């Protein structure tokens, strides 16, 4: 009976690789509970972002399946910022939400945009500024499930904490790919999926620190 209202996302014996000779996952099984804050960690290149793309249906498994419940409405923050219209201003990227001017300015202010900054075209923004615009849109999406793929890339430490505070208050299901200890420490993570082993453990900051140090040494 999966997925159900209480289990919005479930992976059942998922096998995937870009080639049959180099599988990223072999019979990976896990489920995510409604309202849970769930973290995916592992070494660089191990398939963390790929798993989110499988959940979104952008890739197809070789065997097994990822099931998403019919009532699961997902908003997906990808590193490519595909939800942004580069030809529009920051302000006009929010036109579909029908917010009053003061409401939108308040929201953008909470993501560190103020004054005439909101009239800048997204195409001229820095990578960090684009990230902030995309995350602001995610926060407004009305989705009951949010996927965040490395949301702190290009963000300074102060901004990272602001973003963490925003998504800590999110009452839906949150699935995060990150090895940024300071950020995930402030999200209220419940459980973690360790790749490539597929182990599920309760949140352990020492494990996150291990992967943070390991991945930084590879950069």
Q: Which residues make up each language-model segment?
A:
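ABC ATP-binding cassette signature C-motif
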Residues: 3-219
């Amino acid at each position: 009976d999966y997925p159900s209202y209480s289990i919005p996302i479930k992976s059942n014996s998922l096998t995937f690789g870009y080639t049959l000779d180099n599988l990223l996952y072999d019979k990976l099984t896990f489920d995510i509970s409604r309202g849970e804050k769930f973290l995916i960690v592992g070494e660089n290149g191990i398939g963390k972002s790929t798993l989110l793309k499988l959940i979104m249906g952008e890739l197809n498994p070789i065997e097994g399946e990822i099931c998403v419940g019919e009532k699961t409405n997902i908003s997906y923050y990808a590193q490519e910022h595909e939800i942004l219209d580069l030809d529009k201003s920051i302000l006009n990227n929010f036109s579909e939400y029908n917010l009053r001017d003061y409401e939108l300015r308040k929201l953008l202010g909470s993501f560190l945009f103020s004054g005439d900054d909101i009239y800048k075209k997204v195409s001229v923004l820095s990578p960090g500024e684009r990230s902030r615009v995309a995350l602001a849109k995610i926060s407004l999406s009305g989705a009951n499930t949010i996927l965040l793929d490395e949301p702190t890339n290009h963000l300074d430490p102060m901004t990272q904490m602001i973003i963490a505070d925003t998504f800590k208050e999110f009452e839906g299901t949150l699935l995060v790919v990150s090895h940024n200890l300071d950020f995930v420490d402030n999200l209220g993570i419940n459980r973690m999926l360790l790749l490539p082993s597929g182990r599920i453990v309760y949140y352990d900051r020492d494990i996150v620190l291990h992967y943070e140090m390991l991945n930084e040494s590879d950069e």
